[in-house]
């Protein structure tokens, strides 16, 4: 009789890519704060600086934390599946709450200043991304954390969940880039083309946002870096194939 399976070692390059992604993500958050502090006066809720809460919260929530939530199944390869599910879900909750604060901040700022809402491409994309993110979390909770969902439903929905998770993350980064460009054009106008220090800093920030998204998506698309099936998952997978003659669920 075989003993318990030993933990699968992490692929050699995976820890380095994960560490690089975290370095990029933290740099993006720090540089966003530096941009707002150096050129936009900082952040505050009860003042004209309330708008600055918006970009910082969106970068922390819908870019950095969402990206980290997607990496949970690559980083925690040998922990119990339930534990990784809960961590994956909690990171999305934190991302949602922080993004919600950012969304409230921009609407409150517009209301106080008498500005129009939801007229730009950035705002349309932002509302779409926020709605998709919330819907994805609700459906994911219903299928993978709520005990009532059947194994067959989970296995059939999982590919869609994985795809839309990556797609929403990519759309979040694209929306952040749109917002960054919009903020620069509003503030700098024609001076943007004269290599103003703020414009250069923001351009570097945009490149780092794109780099963070690229590294995260690369980690997610490497099939050999997926979380290996644990013993109980393999047993459920075999039972499901026997009963339904369908495909066994792949790990995220």
From Swiss-Prot:
Its EC number is 7.2.1.-. It comes from the Eukaryota. SMART domains: B561 (SM00665). Residues 39-52, 108-125, 181-199 are vesicular. Its main location: membrane. InterPro entries: CYB561/CYBRD1-like, Cyt_b561/ferric_Rdtase_TM. One of its GO terms (cellular component) is chromaffin granule membrane. Keywords: Acetylation, Cytoplasmic vesicle, Electron transport, Heme, Iron, Membrane, Metal-binding, Phosphoprotein, Translocase, Transmembrane, Transmembrane helix, Transport. It is a multi-pass membrane protein. Binds 2 heme b groups non-covalently. Heme b 1 binds at residues 54, 117-120, 122, 182. This is Transmembrane ascorbate-dependent reductase CYB561. The gene is CYB561.
